[in-house]
Amino acid sequence: MFWHLDMYPTHPAAEADEGRRGVVMESPGKVWLMTIEDEHWRSRHGARAEIGPLSISSGEEYSAQHVEAVFTPGMTAPDHFHSGPEAWYTLAGETCLETSDGRVQIGRVRGRAVMVARGLSMHLSATCTEQRRALVLILHETSQDATLPVHDWIPKRLCTQNPVDPPQ
């Protein structure tokens, strides 16, 4: 599965392309059609970004939670995990994500989208001097909560040790 993000000039234009797996959302002054489909799906219009593949289990039912996440400089999210993949597309600012598998990912404008596999514990912090804004997808198992707190993992604070983007 892939998360397709298409930007439109108006809400009605996005709704015309919505389809059964799409959601129209306005986020900072722009209209977005967010669709979860296979990699070959295309909207009829819209400026596009494509994120994936998102790893999901066949036979499992998933629900999508779409969020506009806003962080102030230096802000951190409580340590947490999801029962399915999470991805985000950064619109402004920058974040650093440390996961329980020892990886670090940087989310920034014109950078690669951040993708996190199900079940990984996460420590997320805004590492910029401006407000961070991102469109976020949490594709979680329908039978479970979208976000769950972490109590058995202590981050190594890798994001405070001058993280660099991993090689592409």
Tell me what each language-model feature is.
Residues 1-16, 59-63, 71, 95, ...:
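Short acidic-glycine-tyrosine-enriched beta hairpin
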Residues 1-44:
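N-terminal accessory interaction module
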Residues 19-31, 96, 117-145:
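Ligand-binding loop in jelly-roll beta-barrel domains
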Residues 25-27, 59-62, 81, 89, ...:
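Extracellular/periplasmic catalytic domains that process cell-envelope and extracellular macromolecules
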Residues 27-76:
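Flexible, surface-exposed loop/linker segments and immediately adjacent secondary-structure boundaries
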Residues 39-51, 55-56, 127-168:
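Double-stranded beta-helix
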Residues 70-71, 82-98, 139:
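Short, conserved beta-strand element in jelly-roll/cupin
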Residues 76-82, 99, 106, 125-126:
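Short histidine-centered beta-strand/loop micro-motifs
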